[in-house]
């Protein structure tokens, strides 16, 4: 039996204002008992919907127009979603990154034993994000049904990511037993459906409907920190499980499949916790007479030429950042094996140690948003990445690149481009009307998906391209986006926070 409950939510909250402002809105002051019972079950599933009043305890149904480039006036600048929902989204990001990178140390050896090449290994690493790009539109339709009044139901892509990751890891693990090379690729493609969640990690943590302006950059950088920790944990577990299972002859659990089986079990446990603890923050209710926010009525000014150019720039910045990081990550086992005679375990340690080193710096960079603008964070991050690429290019060209300088340069490059790409969505949400928030997320995710796939393929073929050519290519496209950043410098000025 379904129960209809009145849900008054984020976009309708408004602090007490003057009589002139109140004349255009109706105010409801709930009792304590009403607020305590402010969780409801709806037709969207058995997911709790949280309702939180403003600091004065009032819930206001605002019907005034939103400014095209500012946060909704009804939203507290320090507002954020329920903390346990934030934790589950960040954990999903971390585990998704683990699923993406746990194959890095052993991928080349796994594909080789089944008859594949290094380039095919790069394709195995990079294909999931391309599949996520293909599945992006169906997922957008699924997460934004008509009954949601234009808002996003984040639980839907979350649970889809769990199911697809479980199936993907299962197929990847069974490829050795089947002795079929392409089952590895099919398994990774199934996992790619779950990687559509990379879009929703960004949009959830910067959603202007329930994330205040003072929180968006901070949460966006926490999202990058989760990715860094996921890269560290995935590469480390992939290497150590491969080493621990090196002498096993079991066709099911061995050095090539142990990491994938491990992630399969972790995803099963996570999906159970997700179903129990995730709380959907809903910003509208069809059962009430609340007027739909103007941000979704289509009565907003179209994007200007500079705003469109900015979106193209953000997509390209995302592409280049991830292209560099993914390309280098994929090339490390191949590059280190040729130069330093590294095995998969040592390559996994190399990747995980680098992530471990930069993780504290990424964490401290989350507080930079209090003093630095988004554009300044991007500038400093890209500058660090470019300098690391220049030094690596010179050392590689003269064939004087010991493992220690290589490790330092790789870590600086990864840190620079990771931090530089952190505020992309946050910057756009501060510049554009809330109506364009999801479009911004999609544009950035397109750049990330293409960069991940192309970068991984190029990294896997590093010796076919030549090492100097690979590094020079990374440097050239990084300089291109750096020039675009300088061109847009005055246009993308935003407040700190």
UniProtKB/Swiss-Prot annotation:
It is found in: Membrane. Residues 1-16 have a biased composition (Polar residues). It is a multi-pass membrane protein. Residues 1-29 are annotated as: Disordered. One of its GO terms (cellular component) is membrane. Keywords: Membrane, Phosphoprotein, Transmembrane, Transmembrane helix. The keyword Transmembrane applies. Pfam families: MFS_1. CDD domains: MFS_MFSD8. The modification Phosphoserine is found at residues 64, 295. The chain crosses the membrane at residues 86-106, 120-140, 155-175, 180-200, 222-242, 258-278, 309-329, 348-368, 377-397, 407-427, 443-463, 468-488. Its main location: membrane. GO terms for molecular function: transmembrane transporter activity. PANTHER family: INNER MEMBRANE TRANSPORT PROTEIN YAJR, MEMBRANE TRANSPORTER. This is Uncharacterized protein CC613.01.
């Amino acid at each position: 039996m379904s129960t209809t409950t009145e849900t008054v939510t984020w976009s309708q909250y408004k602090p007490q204002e003057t009589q002139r402002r109140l004349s255009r809105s109706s105010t409801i002051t709930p009792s304590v008992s009403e607020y305590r019972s402010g969780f409801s079950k709806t037709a969207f599933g058995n997911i709790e919907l949280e309702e939180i009043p403003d600091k004065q305890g009032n819930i206001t149904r605002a019907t005034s127009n939103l400014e095209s480039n500012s946060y909704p006036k009804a939203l507290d600048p320090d507002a954020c979603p329920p903390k346990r929902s934030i934790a589950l989204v960040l954990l999903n990001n971390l585990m998704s990154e683990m699923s993406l990178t746990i194959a890095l140390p052993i991928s080349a050896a796994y594909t080789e034993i089944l008859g594949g090449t290094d380039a095919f290994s790069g394709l195995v690493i990079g294909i999931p994000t391309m599949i996520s790009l293909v599945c992006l539109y169906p997922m957008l339709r699924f997460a934004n049904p008509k009954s949601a009044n234009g808002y996003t139901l984040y639980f839907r892509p979350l649970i889809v990511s769990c199911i697809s990751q479980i199936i993907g890891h299962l197929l990847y693990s069974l490829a050795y037993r089947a002795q079929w090379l392409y089952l590895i690729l099919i398994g990774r493609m199934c996992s790619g459906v779950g990687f559509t969640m990379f879009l929703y990690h960004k949009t959830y943590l910067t959603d202007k409907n329930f994330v205040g302006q003072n929180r968006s950059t901070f949460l966006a950088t926490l999202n990058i920190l989760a990715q860094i920790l996921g890269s560290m944990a995935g590469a480390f577990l992939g290497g150590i499980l491969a080493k621990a299972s090196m002498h096993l002859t079991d066709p099911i659990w061995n050095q090539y499949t142990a990491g994938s089986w491990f992630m399969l079990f972790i995803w099963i446990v996570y999906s159970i916790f997700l179903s129990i603890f995730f709380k959907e923050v809903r910003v509208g209710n069809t059962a009430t007479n609340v007027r739909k926010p103007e941000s979704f009525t289509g009565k907003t000014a179209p994007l200007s030429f500079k705003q469109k150019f900015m979106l193209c720039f953000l997509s390209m910045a995302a592409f280049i950042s991830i292209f560099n990081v993914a390309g280098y990550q994929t090339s490390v086992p191949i590059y280190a094996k040729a130069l330093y005679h590294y095995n998969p375990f040592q390559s996994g340690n190399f990747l995980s140690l680098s992530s471990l080193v930069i993780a504290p710096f990424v964490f401290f960079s989350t507080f930079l948003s209090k003093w630095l603008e988004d554009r300044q964070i991007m500038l400093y991050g890209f500058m660090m990445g470019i300098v690391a690429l220049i030094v690596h290019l010179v050392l590689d060209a003269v064939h004087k690149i010991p493992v220690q300088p290589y490790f330092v340069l790789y870590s600086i490059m990864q840190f620079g481009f990771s931090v530089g790409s952190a505020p992309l969505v946050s910057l756009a949400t501060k510049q554009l009307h809330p109506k364009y928030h999801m479009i911004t997320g999609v544009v950035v995710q397109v750049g990330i998906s293409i960069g991940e796939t192309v970068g991984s393929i190029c990294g896997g073929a590093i010796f076919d391209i030549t090492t100097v050519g690979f590094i020079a290519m990374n440097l050239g496209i990084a300089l291109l986006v750096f020039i675009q950043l300088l061109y847009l410098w005055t246009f993308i000025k935003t407040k700190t926070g």
